[in-house]
Amino acid sequence: MALIIAGERSGVGKTTTTLTLLAALKARQASVQSFKVGPDYIDPMFHRFVTGRDCRNLDPILTDEDYVQHCFQQHSQTADYTLVEGVMGLFDGLTGKTDTASTAHIARILNLPILLVLNCSSTARSIAAIAYGYQNFDSRLKIAGLVLNRVGSDRHLELLKDALEPLEIPILGVLRRQDEIQIPDRHLGLIPTSELPHLQSVIDRLAVLGQQCFDWNRLEPLLSNSDLNSTAFKSTTPSISLKSSVPIAIARDRAFNFYYADNFDLLRAAGAELIEWSPLQDRQLPAGVQGLYLGGGFPEVFAAELSDNLLARQAVQTAITQGIPCYAECGGLMYLRQHIIDFEQTQYPMVGAIAATAQMGSRLTLGYREATAQQASPLLQKGQVVWGHEFHRSSLREPIAQPLFQLQNFDGSLHYGEGYSQPNLHASYLHLHFGGKPWLIQNFLQACQQATALSR
């Protein structure tokens, strides 16, 4: 068994509840496997910080329902407990007409009971109407319990319990208003763990709260994996004939840290040797690499440091010029441009492999896209289709003459042309999950294997 943590809406305390439960279980010396519904990168960083295990994303759009089931079973089998953090409100999905890609959708795919987090601030009896609606909106779902968050006084809690009693939904946790457990955020959500030097003290506090604020006699059996069936699954790793392992340089530091753990696993399983390097601190690329992987992150926050590291910028430019295949997404795309202009309108030189400038702004570009390749790249042939996810506040100052992708929204409406390609370059705002299209790995590694290894 496992639990999925859902909220009545965004901002009610799903992440706080999840981290509190994870910290409390970890304090008991238990192994805990966590998952995150949807394409988010930052919440899984916090999960990993607490549990010491990679959090796995469950996304039926970037992958598919079979992959979601495979991923969940595969990684839950090696842990004592399993916990899934939902996304937005329980039923919030791609459209208002369906709950596709919502927390409810994942709960049905995996047949998981739901722990519903309610924001009880400034409400009393009305909380029962909210809980009743969620309890009865979809009869296929099981609300196993409630977490009452942001509870004020003891009198407030008594009113809430009296109101909820007729619904017969167990109250499995009560979290009081706590200013000292707030985690700071900025323009794309929570600030990543690598930038929070005092995070461990917050997690320690959450572990204590977790022991005190939850009904563990009823909660622990719901989280335990003792009855999880061991299942054999068909491998999702593509069959690739490689002469030897292919060394790939992975940009990974405070500026670049948006990666799916599954992508790394799938690359390694297919024959890649992943070598981490830092565009912030390292002066050269690792010797002998045959490919570059520049993930997303916050290059705009560290633009001055990235710009100051001239040797690293030159090394990346040289590698691409020499024909080393490069896969860059979102923050990696921004790094490859000529300049980044930050929120204060300060301009910083970047790699310059793409003749364009990244301009930060207030407008958030967000959502799933169906992307059809208009040009070939190291990952795709012209005409191939993938699903990806956009999440950024930067934009392009110059038009793209021959975009890599033509994008469509989930409803099929035309969006726009996006991305850059060369025979050895794939650079796009789209975040891709290789579990959805394993042939992306095959194309990339075969292109890398054909490249001459980088020499200094």
Curated annotation (Swiss-Prot):
Cofactors required: Mg(2+)
Keywords of the record: ATP-binding, Cobalamin biosynthesis, Glutamine amidotransferase, Ligase, Magnesium, Nucleotide-binding
CDD domains: CobB_N, GATase1_CobB
SUPFAM superfamilies with a match to the protein in the record: Class I glutamine amidotransferase-like, P-loop containing nucleoside triphosphate hydrolases
Catalyses which reaction(s): cob(II)yrinate + 2 L-glutamine + 2 ATP + 2 H2O = cob(II)yrinate a,c diamide + 2 L-glutamate + 2 ADP + 2 phosphate + 2 H(+)
Any one of the GO BP annotations: cobalamin biosynthetic process
Catalytic residues in the record: 330
Pfam families in the record: CbiA, GATase_3
Gene3D superfamilies attached to this UniProt entry: 3.40.50.880, P-loop containing nucleotide triphosphate hydrolases
Domain GATase cobBQ-type: 247-439
UniProt site (Increases nucleophilicity of active site Cys): 431
Domain notes: Comprises of two domains. The C-terminal domain contains the binding site for glutamine and catalyzes the hydrolysis of this substrate to glutamate and ammonia. The N-terminal domain is anticipated to bind ATP and cobyrinate and catalyzes the ultimate synthesis of the diamide product. The ammonia produced via the glutaminase domain is probably translocated to the adjacent domain via a molecular tunnel, where it reacts with an activated intermediate.
Something else known: The a and c carboxylates of cobyrinate are activated for nucleophilic attack via formation of a phosphorylated intermediate by ATP. CbiA catalyzes first the amidation of the c-carboxylate, and then that of the a-carboxylate.
Protein name as annotated: Cobyrinate a,c-diamide synthase
Organism the protein comes from: Synechococcus sp. (strain ATCC 27144 / PCC 6301 / SAUG 1402/1) (Anacystis nidulans)
